[in-house]
Regions:
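Bacterial N-terminal signal peptides that target proteins for export
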Residues: 1-11
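Pocket-flanking alpha-helical
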Residues: 75-106, 211
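Bacterial N-terminal signal peptides
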Residues: 9-20
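Exported/periplasmic ABC-transporter solute-binding proteins
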Residues: 4-5, 22-64, 74-75, 79-82, ...
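Short, glycine-/small- and polar/acidic-enriched structural segments
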Residues: 88, 95, 110-113, 118-120
Length: 304
């Protein structure tokens, strides 16, 4: 039997493998990701987690896509976004000019899409008789002035959007050392208030509108307080109607910020949230959609 030389064959096989590897390396990283297909991750302000979970669940059921949700405090979310831990984020504010410069240096222009109006809610133990609270009293408490109606303010995280929002409102740079309690999540805040009378919790309202099965018994033990705005006379609860009429004083817009720089799932998910289906999900969640979904009314010519 004639034997073929082994070395040329091995050499040829090696060249073939190198060629194949080079072709694989030259493929675009995002080749398998489109606006409605593939996988990605989304950074989420923890105070907004429930509405994002609802949106992602439906999006994944409709498209061949997988979105990993990474809940963090607002400060941690923005830091992770700037470090490319993920290139999509959902926040209760836009990026400021300094934050946008980080992406400009990478030749990426963040695309910001507003999709809902949320609210910061004050909650108390259900055993508390008072269901009203004046925003001025809360501001004064944040400035170190004691108030007989407020035993303590309970926040989710020192780096959270609720803390940043309330500090900006009060004109303070940091929370006072006395009468302030903080945890890691909104769930922990709700549970602490449910177990302690006299405490006022500060949470994202979407944690209260459609609580999980685990949280429902706990939410049943708290009261969502109606708030009187600074310089106002009437009290308003954080309902969809009051948000729409701009009566509730602690409303805030929600944004999805896409820093992918290409046509990927960030673009597709943003379009979904701001579109018909996403806005219906927002409406059902208890938040205020940017665009009120239309209703199809069938008119019958004859009544049977």
């Amino acid at each position: 039997m004639k034997k073929f030389p082994l070395i040329p064959f091995v050499f040829f096989l090696g060249l073939l493998l190198v060629f194949f590897a080079c072709n694989q390396n030259n493929k675009p990283k995002n080749e398998e990701e489109t606006i409605l297909k593939g996988s990605t991750s989304v950074l989420v302000d923890e105070t907004l987690l429930p509405i994002v979970e609802d949106q992602v669940e439906v999006f994944e059921s409709l498209y061949d896509a997988k979105i990993q949700i990474n809940p963090k405090s607002e400060a941690e979310t923005i830091l992770a976004l700037s470090k490319d831990t993920s290139k999509i984020a959902i926040l209760s504010r836009k990026l400021n000019p300094e934050e946008e410069k980080v992406f400009s240096s990478k030749k990426i222009k963040p695309r910001t899409t507003v999709f809902a109006t949320d609210a910061i809610a004050f909650i108390s133990n259900q055993r508390n008789k008072d269901t009203l609270i004046a925003l001025q009293d809360v501001v004064n408490f944040l400035k170190g002035m004691p108030n007989s109606k407020i035993k303590g303010l309970v926040f989710d995280n020192p780096n959270s959007s609720t803390v940043r929002y309330m500090n900006e409102l009060a004109g303070t740079k940091e929370l006072p050392s006395k009468g302030i309690f903080s945890f890691k999540t909104n769930e922990e805040v709700i549970q602490f208030v449910a177990e302690n009378e006299g405490m006022i919790g500060v949470v994202g309202v979407n944690w209260l509108m459609e609580p999980s099965l685990k949280m429902r018994p706990i939410v049943d033990k708290i009261t969502i307080l109606s708030v009187k705005g600074i310089g106002k006379t009437d009290y308003f609860a954080p309902t969809q109607n009051n948000l729409a009429e701009k009566k509730y004083p602690l409303a805030r817009e929600l944004y999805i910020i896409n820093c992918q720089g290409y046509s990927g799932l960030g673009m597709g998910f943003a379009s979904f949230i701001a579109g018909e289906v996403g806005q219906r999900i927002t409406l059902k969640s208890g938040l205020l959609p940017v665009k009120m979904p239309g209703r199809n009314i069938k008119v019958r010519k004859q009544i049977k």
